[in-house]
Every structure is written in structure tokens, then in C-alpha cells.
């Protein structure tokens, strides 16, 4: 299926992606920190456009590959980053992660919002063909979808990131 998402043109296979996600573990099966537990529970409260977007690509948001807290925002939401995988290719577009420096043993990247697709006011994604932590057996070809999202604190416990 060919789709256009802002500057990105993707060829995806949502059914192949969905079939693999059925076998994957939940975020909290791999990490029990407050940030991961909050993200997994907050999925139930995501705006319809965010839920429908992930569903249309075959991705179960509660089973994404990597999620992490960047910081608490002044409005009390948590700025999350992370990524997940989907079956497909990217004939057009470039990642929001832009290299700013390279040394003999490391690279430094910066996130450029101009290279993202906005799903909602608080949720942006970017795509890239260079992938990290691809799950064993994930069908090829594989794309990585990078996430940046401001998500409310929904756990019934104190927010340790404030």
C-alpha cells in the first residue's frame, strides 16, 4: 500500500506488520519503569487520529520497540521519544534525525521537527530505513518509525518526572 504522509512516501504492508505485532510483547514486559507503564496505559486515552494512524499501519502501540521519557513539559505532560518498526520501504522522505557531528567513535544527531509528520498537535513521527533493535524474525523490508509525543500522566501514582 502506497501512502503519502507529508514529505514521506511509504510503501507499507499493514497486514504483515499486524501479524508480527500479535506475537510481540507489551512495552511493560521489558521495562517496569513509571515512564513505560504510563505510556502503555496512556495508549487507551490517545486521540482517535493517533490510534487510527498506528492501526492503519498495523502497529500495536502498546508493543512498540522502544519508548523513553525526554522530560516533563511545563503543562504537566511528558515528552516521550521512541521508535517502532513496520513492514515497508520509503521511496521518498528523510529522517528527522540529522547528524550534526561525527568523531572517530561517535555521532551526534539533532531532531528536526521540519522533517516530521504531525498526527495531532502533540504527536509527531518520522521514518527512516536505518533501523535499530529490530525484533528477531521481523518481516523484511523493514522501516523504523520514530516518535515524539507529549503525553499526559495517567497513572494513579505520583509523576516522578516533575
Which residues make up each language-model segment?
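Short Fe-S-cluster ligation motifs
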Residues: 61-76
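Intrinsic-disorder-associated interaction segments
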Residues: 10, 43-47, 79
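Short flanking/linker segments adjacent to small metal-binding domains or redox-active Cys/His motifs
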Residues: 72-120
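Ordered hydrophobic segments in well-structured contexts
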Residues: 32, 77-88, 124, 141-150
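A structural detector for beta-sheet-dominated domains
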Residues: 11, 55, 62, 87-89, ...
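Short, charged low-complexity linear segments at domain edges
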Residues: 1-22
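Glycine-rich, aromatic-bearing surface loops/beta-hairpins
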Residues: 115-162
